[in-house]
């Protein structure tokens, strides 16, 4: 995966100036009517926050053609500095929408449960814990 160090610059490069002018772009952002892959933008923001917090960026991807149970992608793997019973890897999924699934995270946790610490989903909603997964608002990313 490749992330841009400046998310603002990424957004400005994502639009052709001839298609959307400055004021129109800002209005669309403010009214949540922007036709863009918001998942890419939010994932880039999270990557930028992880780097600013001193984390190295790792991810997991398996595109198995033979076994659907092995097909999964995890946006980030965060290494915790302390070992707790040999579990110091936290899988992190980033979700930009209000409705989403956790299929990849669930498969990953089941497959690698012995090596994992706490799984996280970073999203635009409130903080909660459900079935052992911590759901963090985006603004709390730097606390990982």
Feature-to-residue mapping (PLM):
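Domain-level recognition of nuclease-like catalytic cores that cleave nucleotide substrates
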Residues: 122-144
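Active-site-adjacent loop/helix micro-motif of nuclease/hydrolase catalytic cores
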Residues: 69, 97-107
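Short polar/acidic secondary-structure junctions
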Residues: 81-84, 97, 127
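Accessory nucleic acid-recognition modules appended to NTPase machines
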Residues: 1-74, 78-84
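Switch/connector loops and helix/strand junctions flanking conserved nucleotide-binding motifs
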Residues: 12, 101-102, 128-133
